[in-house]
Amino acid sequence: MEVLRRSSVFAAEVMEVFDRSPTDKELVSQAKALCRDYINSRLIRAGVSWSKPEHNTPVPGGKLAEVSAILLRLGDELEYIRPNVYRNIARQLNISLHSETVVTDAFLAVAAQIFTAGITWGKVVSLYAVAAGLAVDCVRHAQPAMVHTIVDCLGEFVRKTLVTWLKRRGGWADITKCVVSTDPSLRSHWLVAAVCSFGHFLKAIFFVLLPER
């Protein structure tokens, strides 16, 4: 799908900014590129990719590729621990995938609740896992255009909520510390933080299901 190939347009620019302090706009662009890559990986894994990757389609390289690989690796661990949380997202939220407004509101509600008690890399990984799970649901229900909506929503959430936090850590490359550190407490920290976010995720489901008054 074209939405997943658009990352190639600015791939070189996204990779270049890892060598200096990134701007807000660059961090958001990187977030969306990482989201497309994460979603594409999960679509392929679920066997619901709607088109075969073209041979001439560029893939992320350099540090961006490293960040993407680590994000997917941590996502694998998170989804292994709580597989039911990141599957059938639309059914858990009891939402229609035919309305862009409904999908947008539901995703942003879940995202906001995940980060209610603060920001950690574990929660960031959880956010991407939710986005990918919802994207898989959309494609399975013949709504592939919603993938672009989800990517944009994640980018907007990053802009409003995570950019300052990311800049303090020097950008997305900071996530590599989750796997290269020899301190076991650092590695377990992101897992504990993500597990704690499960409660917020379920709370978000409750709020989304509340009828309007």
Curated annotation (Swiss-Prot):
GO terms for molecular function: channel activity. Gene3D superfamilies: Blc2-like. Keywords: Apoptosis, Membrane, Transmembrane, Transmembrane helix. The gene is BOK. SUPFAM superfamilies: Bcl-2 inhibitors of programmed cell death. Belongs to the Bcl-2 family. A motif (BH2) lies at residues 165-179. One of its GO terms (biological process) is release of cytochrome c from mitochondria. It comes from the Eukaryota. A motif (BH3) lies at residues 67-83. The keyword Transmembrane applies. May play a role in apoptosis. A motif (BH4) lies at residues 32-44. It is found in: Membrane. One of its GO terms (cellular component) is mitochondrial outer membrane. The chain crosses the membrane at residues 190-210. It is a single-pass membrane protein. This is Bcl-2-related ovarian killer protein. A motif (BH1) lies at residues 113-132. It comes from Gallus gallus (Chicken). InterPro entries: Bcl-2-like_sf, Bcl-2_BH1-3, Bcl-2_fam, Bcl2-like.
